[in-house]
């Protein structure tokens, strides 16, 4: 009889562990998505799916794509498309990198709110971030050595901005690399000569203002019309078509309820 009870207890324990694992969703990757948007999506999803838990690590798009390749997350957040080398690395491990566009974004160039400059051209942005121009007086400002803040190299925004705004040139040698959008906004907000870039969801941070680029401001309308030059899609990556809880969360994100949150946070809905 004791053996039967022991066997039953073990079976219930295993079932409980399996159930707990089934209700846990591991999401890794992009800070742009993972610092604000995905946690808010997760909270609403949990309200509709009691018992669900999330493990969200927002450490850069590269880490999210790597997590899908390594099998350490069900969803990888990315503000950029997976590189050919990453797709190949996934295939070598029997993984199929499946992208789902979940929101659109505009990369905003921000300066300190005390900076008198009213706007920049695409050429001036390239010159500033590559180090060709090092003083605000060269781009219509009142003078002062420009302090450039960028994301770190694991960030999708780091590589996207390099491609969209800098013709794939290298960043200025003295640029300071930050871990996330909020850190860039904080540093620029404290430095009258600072300049950096953030996703649209972060432009309302205190002490900063977003620059019109060739007259176009980053907004839902300009991103949808592609008139703002630094627009981009953002992604969830999964190993093939998502299933189970991952599928439910992806479907929620791209559905009406999720896209309402996308807009509220400051991103641009996909529809």
PLM feature segments, named:
Residues 21-271:
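Exported/periplasmic ABC-transporter solute-binding proteins
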Residues 1-7:
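Bacterial N-terminal signal peptides that target proteins for export
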Residues 7-16:
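Bacterial N-terminal signal peptides
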